[in-house]
């Protein structure tokens, strides 16, 4: 019977065959190849240390990928066959002798990369094998901390087990970046993963506990249960799935009530037990029977003892009070009066407090008081801002100048006054009930102070993280897309362009100064008013505002007059330079009217921005239709299907007045991309735009236009030179007319553009062309008949030429 070879858990896969083809000693070589392809640490390394290197496949990969003249050292318990450019020796990495040997090979160098692909001899219990491998990883890390350079890389194999997380924690303390990965060449059934640690911190001193397996893999003691929280805050319960206690299989604890009375820690019993039993034991219990007959032991107490897990804070307090009463009756607790009488003889002497200590305590108390006050003010300010944001989001804002006209200059006619409240009888109501409400609200605010501050800080932190992640995403996107980088560069260039100062800047600063002034509503007195408005503004309260208004109008009028005069002079200069048109006198007239008219308070920079828009010579805006939507709208307005009022009405939609203040950048980008009106377009408009872009794209680019221009310029230069030479030949009396004509013809032929060389057409001698004599049918110009024999002759000629060269 033939012997069938076992495949050993699928180890003879494609990586095994590839390792045989490439000449690697083990399939594990491809694990390092894939790790290096992902992280790229071998190309940057000059010195490498490979721990547990047998049979040497990782050293082979390192010798191929690392630069020339690199130092590679491999060590293992098993012997390693020699590898070119690699130093190998046989030692145990846990011994001091191995450290000395490595130090002798490295000399004064530090390793840029330390590799570890070792594993113990497995085959016993899995828990023991995983722990042995974790210990081996810790030993390799100890060697790495001794020989690794600052910023170096450490790559190790780890088994997935309960010791994996402690190892990962140790790695993160010593390296800047720690990533766990599983290369494709690693078998899926294998529990191994590879941890790549980059950026070694190289601390000056390392705590020995970091590299001690007894300390790193020690099992943590169970935390003491918080029974006080279970008793005093039973409503706030968080399930913690931590398993069961040893030996507690039923999860139900029942103890007699006498144990609860006699214990010194009743809260622990209430937090851990399920029931307090009044049931008598078989032998009988006199104390338990007495407890059951006491008048303090009511039916409510008995019901509470039946199930402690469903009780609330109030019921637990009742049980504790009942316990104290019972202990006093049984004489287990001494009353406070008796305790004072017994301890009256012993009087404690309190030493007077030192002056310096008293000053320190007073300063500490004042500092705490000041911090509490600032925290309270900050909380109120945050609450006010939050309410203001909510009001703005819900469009609940109201004009703040409504009712301001009733205020006098000193505020004597304010809306609220204490005298009016006393007359109306509201002062007593405020003193009785409102003050209590305020105090209660302040106490509630003080309780929720910490939670609100924490939630506010957490929200700000999350927003900052989202913004930073979005910026990283944008940078990665720009790195991949060259068009996006060019677009951003154009935006930055346009933003950096400086065109000097303009009058609008000065006007903007004047507006800011005006905004800084208090908002005192000024009622216009000039102009046409309705009857109701005239009656309203005839009140006594508006009589003192005329002088103030006139002074402000005069000041603003002088400024606006100077601006208008400057614009008028500029317009006149432009009209002198440009040809006169019909629109010029109208513009000049408008400028004069604005200069002579009284300036209004509502004038802003928007009126001056219109003059900066690009315009044609005839005064019309220089607007080009480049989208299908614009073309469709232009066609509709040209045919009369839509009017300007319809276009104005279409501008009022749900996309027009979106509130974008305070929104993050990533949200605004997404909204601008997707949340926009979808305007219908016609087939004719789309075709017109396509035709327009087709005509634009048909035009040659700038480089082609420049090349054609250069060719035309050179041709013109040649013709001019030829004309001058022809004139010289015509004036030469020594030459005959025939010679002159021939010389001019030769110069013309040389100056003329040469015809492109006609390619020789190859005709294969097979089929109808086999053995043909003369020109084949359908072939014009130069031709050459070729066959397979000719190919062989050409190859033979090339071989002979090479031999002669040698």
From Swiss-Prot:
Keywords: Methyltransferase, Nucleus, Ribosome biogenesis, rRNA processing, S-adenosyl-L-methionine, Transferase. Residues 461-484, 578-601 have a biased composition (Basic and acidic residues). InterPro entries: RNA_methyltr_RlmE, RNA_MeTrfase_FtsJ_dom, rRNA-MeTfrase_E, rRNA_MeTfrase_SPB1-like_C, rRNA_MeTfrase_Spb1_DUF3381, SAM-dependent_MTases_sf, SPB1-like. Residues 441-460, 494-515, 546-556, 602-612 have a biased composition (Acidic residues). GO terms for molecular function: rRNA (guanine) methyltransferase activity; rRNA (guanosine-2'-O-)-methyltransferase activity; rRNA (uridine-2'-O-)-methyltransferase activity. SUPFAM superfamilies: S-adenosyl-L-methionine-dependent methyltransferases. GO terms for cellular component: nucleolus; preribosome, large subunit precursor. S-adenosyl-L-methionine binds at residues 56, 58, 76, 92, 117. The keyword Zinc-finger does not apply. Pfam families: DUF3381, FtsJ, Spb1_C. The active site is at 157 (proton acceptor). Residues 368-389, 435-527, 543-623 are annotated as: Disordered. GO terms for biological process: maturation of 5.8S rRNA from tricistronic rRNA transcript (SSU-rRNA, 5.8S rRNA, LSU-rRNA); maturation of LSU-rRNA from tricistronic rRNA transcript (SSU-rRNA, 5.8S rRNA, LSU-rRNA); rRNA methylation. It is an enzyme of class 2 (transferase). It catalyses: a ribonucleotide in rRNA + S-adenosyl-L-methionine = a 2'-O-methylribonucleotide in rRNA + S-adenosyl-L-homocysteine + H(+). It is found in: Nucleus, Nucleolus. HAMAP family: RNA_methyltr_E (MF_01547), RNA_methyltr_E_SPB1 (MF_03163). Belongs to the class I-like SAM-binding methyltransferase superfamily. RNA methyltransferase RlmE family. SPB1 subfamily. Required for proper assembly of pre-ribosomal particles during the biogenesis of the 60S ribosomal subunit. This is AdoMet-dependent rRNA methyltransferase spb1. It comes from Emericella nidulans (strain FGSC A4 / ATCC 38163 / CBS 112.46 / NRRL 194 / M139).
